Curated annotation (Swiss-Prot):
Protein name (Swiss-Prot/TrEMBL): Urease accessory protein UreE
Family note: Belongs to the UreE family.
Compartment list: Cytoplasm
Its biological purpose: Involved in urease metallocenter assembly. Binds nickel. Probably functions as a nickel donor during metallocenter assembly.
CDD domains: UreE
UniProt GO molecular function: nickel cation binding; unfolded protein binding
Any single Pfam family the record assigns to this protein: UreE_C
A GO CC term assigned to this protein in UniProt: cytoplasm
Gene3D superfamilies (alphabetical): Urease metallochaperone UreE, N-terminal domain, UreE, C-terminal domain
Lineage: Bacteria, Pseudomonadati, Campylobacterota, Epsilonproteobacteria, Campylobacterales
Biological-process GO terms, alphabetical: protein folding; protein-containing complex assembly; urea metabolic process
UniProtKB keywords: Chaperone, Cytoplasm, Nickel, Nickel insertion
Length: 176
């Protein structure tokens, strides 16, 4: 079977069709091409023409016929669940995690976040006195916090670099 686009997501509504899943690690959700075997043994070739910018999400439907669906299942992985007590802690957390180029995801409650487990981050959270716990959970691309902009491909015809305009109401405040 060939999957060239994401057909929807299981979260959008129920289906009476037989469900089958392709298990993916969170870091493989960015793939746009590959050959996978589903939990029930079906072979699927993934060749996305317009892949989602944030990657494949848990529940994304890649194949559908009259009787069955094949969707993505993001495998739970060890994660650090971090709980901030203030917006200042959120800013510090985002700065430190971003400075280490680690992935950061929204948590299940306000001011909570998830990141893949890494011992150096655990040590950092201890130093910053952030509350955290190590749990297994799904790191779903739909919950990923990203500030990355798409890069221009200089070899691709018609590709142009991003252009930024300064806002008329831009203010820079320097506190001493």
């Amino acid at each position: 079977m060939l999957a060239e686009s994401v057909l929807g997501n299981l979260k959008e509504g129920g289906s009476s069709k037989e469900l089958d899943f392709i298990d993916l690690e969170w870091f493989d959700a960015q793939k746009r091409m590959g050959r996978f075997t589903s939990q029930k043994g079906a072979e699927l070739v993934l060749k996305l023409k317009n892949p989602p910018k944030m990657g494949l999400c848990d529940g994304d439907i890649l194949f559908e016929d009259a009787t069955s669906l094949i969707a993505i299942n993001i495998i739970p992985t060890p994660t650090l669940h971090v709980y901030a007590d203030s917006t200042a802690q959120v800013a510090r957390l985002c700065y430190e995690v971003g400075n280490r180029h680690a992935s950061l995801y929204y948590g299940d409650s306000p001011l909570s976040f998830k990141t893949p487990f890494e011992r150096p981050l655990q040590v950092l959270f201890d130093k910053l006195a952030l509350r955290y716990e190590v749990l297994k959970s799904k790191l779903d691309a739909s919950q990923r916090i990203s500030v990355s902009a798409p890069h221009a491909d200089p070899l691709q015809e018609g590709s142009a670099p991003l252009k930024f305009k300064s806002a008329l109401d831009l203010q820079i405040v320097i506190k001493k």
